[in-house]
Amino acid sequence: MKRPVLIGITGGTGSGKSTVAKEIYNKFDEACIAMIEQDSYYKDQSSMPFEERCKKNYDHPDAFDNELLIDHLKNLIDLNVIEKPIYDFEAHNRKEETIKVKPRDIIIVEGILVLQDPRVRELLDIKIYVDTDADVRIIRRLLRDINERGRTVDSVINQYLTVVRPMHMQFIEPSKRYADIIIPEGGHNRVAVDMMVANIKHLLQE
């Protein structure tokens, strides 16, 4: 097995980056592709009271354990198995369990700040930024956090205005300049997804 092809997929919250990642993932046999979500690498906060965890800024680069993420990506590149963390969004903390991830021909790395850290960028073979209008993104975030993460409408809106939007403008949007490909319209852009799949297949054949 040769070195895996690493694909970084980023974009603002609710941009459709997870949809793009899943669309690409589903185009390949499960035996040859793996998914690494940056959300799984939020720092362990076991020593922090729950009330404090609720107030933390989770859209800032410091919220992520990039040291562990980079170590895991390098291990996958070296064809080693890793134990990927599992993050509990309701408890705002890592679970004790992990998920075993085996090295595959294709590794997708997906998250809001995947292109922000130069150490992560240099490991990626393809860098994708999913670009979607802000009003669409906030509606998607609202629906997701209420339905999947046990949040209230007021808490989601307050977090968006005080944290999510400022962090998007400061860290996520500027990382667009590092992308090899910018995909508009999120996961609904079938042409872009099909082009990416063709490009990945070409890289695998080289």
Swiss-Prot record:
Keyword Membrane recorded: no
SUPFAM superfamilies: P-loop containing nucleoside triphosphate hydrolases (SSF52540)
Pathway participation: Pyrimidine metabolism; CTP biosynthesis via salvage pathway; CTP from cytidine: step 1/3; Pyrimidine metabolism; UMP biosynthesis via salvage pathway; UMP from uridine: step 1/1
Cellular-component GO terms for this entry: cytoplasm
Listed InterPro entries: P-loop_NTPase, PRK/URK, Uridine_kinase, Uridine_kinase-like
GO BP: any one term: UMP salvage
Family: Belongs to the uridine kinase family.
Protein name according to UniProt: Uridine kinase
Gene field: udk
